[in-house]
Amino acid sequence: MFTAKCAMQNIRNVAIVGSGQMGSGIAQVTASSGFNVMLADVNKKALDRAMKAISQSVTHLSKKQKGTDKEKSDFVTLTMSRIKTCNNVSTAVADADLIIEAAIENIDLKRGIFAQIEQSCKKDSILTTNTSSFLLEDVAKGLQDKTRFGGLHFFNPVPVMKLLEVIRSDDTSDETYATLIKFGTAVGKTTVACKDSPGFIVNRLLIPYFFEAARMYERGDASMTDIDEAMKLGAGHPMGPFELADYIGLDTVKFVMDGWAAKYPEVQLFEASPLVDKLVAEGKLGRKTGDGFYSYKK
């Protein structure tokens, strides 16, 4: 059984499962903060891409944060030396004090990963998910010991964004939660606490905001550009809702809202937008495809 003494252990070894944009970013900030990192992915090519991206990002940051050439070189070398890779999840988590799942947003995939993790990790390891849309209780459905499970929701790009949402379910122990807060601070993030609820804090406010903006445009209340301009100049937002949705990806925004609408059909705020549905069906997903609410093709 997971105990208070176990939870308050010193975290030294961190395993990150999933080497995509989020996983590689989490690996970078964790390693640069002095932790040993094992980055795991069943796809060897994905691991190679992740390590290349991390190296480039660390090198870029060293030029901004460090003074002399030696300080820059030492920072890059030391950070990269702390990151190891593995394409076997069971092996990767065997010695980890903290495990962060950062796979794609597929509930069955995440549950399968945690079933494998729980069978292979230490009894006192802390297990976390970086999910941005699923409830912790849904991700942890098959876990035997839910007291050592919590949420660490980083934001993209991880090396740049300062916020970390730390989430607890009804089963998360106080000791586990305190350790996660401590870890978040140790990797240089400002932590905010949230209970297990749809979208946590940021996405729970942000995603419906996108869709309300889309509905305003669909009703003919205002143009996209005027809505964006109004929120930038009137509310002090760095980007308007349409610009930000294009930046995040319309497929991602739609995926989150569709999931909430299915789970909470009585909540009108979660209703779909015909405009968003049309753009996604046409493959116009935002900046990453060159077209979304706006066109980014040169």
From Swiss-Prot:
Its EC number is 1.1.1.35. Pathway: Lipid metabolism; fatty acid beta-oxidation. PANTHER family: 3-HYDROXYACYL-COA DEHYDROGENASE F54C8.1-RELATED, PTHR43561. The record marks H153 as: Important for catalytic activity. Homodimer. This is Probable 3-hydroxyacyl-CoA dehydrogenase F54C8.1. The keyword Hydrolase does not apply. GO terms for molecular function: 3-hydroxyacyl-CoA dehydrogenase activity; NAD+ binding. The keyword Mitochondrion applies. Pfam families: 3HCDH, 3HCDH_N. GO terms for biological process: fatty acid beta-oxidation. Belongs to the 3-hydroxyacyl-CoA dehydrogenase family. One of its GO terms (cellular component) is mitochondrion. Its main location: mitochondrion. It is found in: Mitochondrion matrix. PROSITE patterns: 3HCDH. Gene3D superfamilies: N-(1-d-carboxylethyl)-l-norvaline Dehydrogenase, domain 2, NAD(P)-binding Rossmann-like Domain. Keywords: Fatty acid metabolism, Lipid metabolism, Mitochondrion, NAD, Oxidoreductase. It catalyses: a (3S)-3-hydroxyacyl-CoA + NAD(+) = a 3-oxoacyl-CoA + NADH + H(+). It comes from Caenorhabditis elegans. It is an enzyme of class 1 (oxidoreductase). InterPro entries: 3-OHacyl-CoA_DH (IPR022694), 3-OHacyl-CoA_DH_CS (IPR006180), 3-OHacyl-CoA_DH_NAD-bd (IPR006176), 3HC_DH_C (IPR006108), 6-PGluconate_DH-like_C_sf (IPR008927), 6PGD_dom2 (IPR013328), Mito_3-hydroxyacyl-CoA_DH (IPR052242), NAD(P)-bd_dom_sf (IPR036291).
